[in-house]
Amino acid sequence: MIHKPIPNSKPLTAYIDGLRGLLSIIIFNAHLTPVIILGYDKVSRSQVSTSPRNVLDIPLVASCVNNWVLFTIPILKLVYSASPAVCLFFAISGYVMSLKWVRYMNHRSQTSEINSARIFTDFGSSIFRRTLRLSLLAMASMIVPFALMKTGFFDRTVVQQHGLTKLERGMRFWLEQWEQFPARHESWWEQTCDLVQNCARIFTVFMQRRDEAFSPRYNPVLWTIKADLRASLALTVTHLALLGTKRSSRLQILAALAVLGVAVGSLECPLFWAGWIIAEIHHAAEQTPLAQGKGTGQPRQKTNTAGMDTFGKTVVLALGCYVASYPTWKPEKAPMFNTFHMMTPGLIVPPRTWHSLGAVLVLYSLRDVPLARRICESSVAQFLGTHSFAIYLIHFCLVISFGPDLFSWVWSRTGHENLQSLAVGFGITYSILFMAVLLTAAIFRRFIESPVNKCVDSLYRSASVRKEA
């Protein structure tokens, strides 16, 4: 008896949702670095001193720096590296935003029976909802830090209280994150006005990241939301500009735009355009089996080429992970990346350029690597993907508010004198913080994100032009 294959009920882009969930946890891991340093410093000091100290005077930091090569192991480094994760987030956004457009263009080239007005209405609806949803949720994420700041629970001078001096950028270990938060004002009215001004920063998307007023200070991670909104506008304009072009011409123009964006120092726009290129490639690959099946009247048979394609994509995925692992700090001390320096002698390539290239390779290949795709489509990854945006928005405030004291409290009981006790204390504290972030993210999604999404949908329906009967 021949059994019919069980159809896969998951959407074709389900792995994208799971990948987003895993990336949100990677960023959570990355932001633990300064928290661990302060927690260890508090429990390891015999007496409190506010005299200027170098962060390298902390034994844990000095030990990590002396063994820096262990923290530059390719692929393993991705577990706690924020920059590659952010680059992949941007590429995914460009990919998802372009999928519908690519499908429309392909369908239009095959048939003229297309309701153009309906298509443009769908595009407009997507832009309206996405922009408003991101903006409202970003502003909502600043309310809790605002309350913690005003009530005195959170103190932006915690690093100065440890007596740690500010070092050059590469040696700060993200300890300057506390300084990015605003000062506490005397009255609630002044603090509220300051919050409103920071909320308004969400819409100033054309400012540069180096400008002091770019990032909303009540939640510094929101700089990526502003960059996302700016790149979304650039991508939408490009969608309209290339509406009447052939696929080959589109790919050439997009590649040129991406290279130009990298040359002028842009991070997010080249990644959005690269996401569009990958959407074009993936869609063309999906159409090839269908075209072959129609031509022969038979379903396409699997051949050895499928296995070779999987092997090739696995190699590309591994290469992408390797490139994305390029160290941000002291890359010359990472012997496993000497190949990069040999390939570009005398040329200084910013680490984020390598991270961007790695992110593009990962997004291009992951879909066709069965093991990687199954991981992203697993129930755990899908759950994290459902809450990924909430995790990203709320984790930073929780980590820097509770993290240092929690690490020091746990280490004071488990001990911190040897590697075993240090690891046990880290595992306990990490588990507590991780569960707290997941619980808070679930609450945020249930009571803030979902109502905001419904409100935006309702607002668009009430504002849209209705068809006449």
UniProtKB/Swiss-Prot annotation:
Record carries keyword rRNA-binding: no
GO function terms (MF aspect): acyltransferase activity, transferring groups other than amino-acyl groups
UniProt entry keywords in alphabetical sequence: Acyltransferase, Membrane, Transferase, Transmembrane, Transmembrane helix
Domain of life: Eukaryota
Chief localization: membrane
Transmembrane regions: 21-41, 70-90, 134-154, 253-273, 346-366, 391-411, 424-444
Membrane-topology annotation of the record: Multi-pass membrane protein
Disulfide topology: none
Compartment(s): Membrane
Pfam families per UniProt: Acyl_transf_3
InterPro entries: Acyl_transf_3_dom, Acyltransferase_3
Pathway assignment: Secondary metabolite biosynthesis
Gene Ontology cellular-component terms listed: membrane
Keyword Membrane: yes
Catalytic activity, EC: 2.3.1.-
Function: Acyltransferase; part of the gene cluster that mediates the biosynthesis of squalestatin S1 (SQS1, also known as zaragozic acid A), a heavily oxidized fungal polyketide that offers potent cholesterol lowering activity by targeting squalene synthase (SS). SQS1 is composed of a 2,8-dioxobicyclic[3.2.1]octane-3,4,5-tricarboxyclic acid core that is connected to two lipophilic polyketide arms.
Similarity comment text for this entry: Belongs to the acyltransferase 3 family.
Protein name per UniProt: Acyltransferase clz18
Organism: Cochliobolus lunatus (Filamentous fungus)
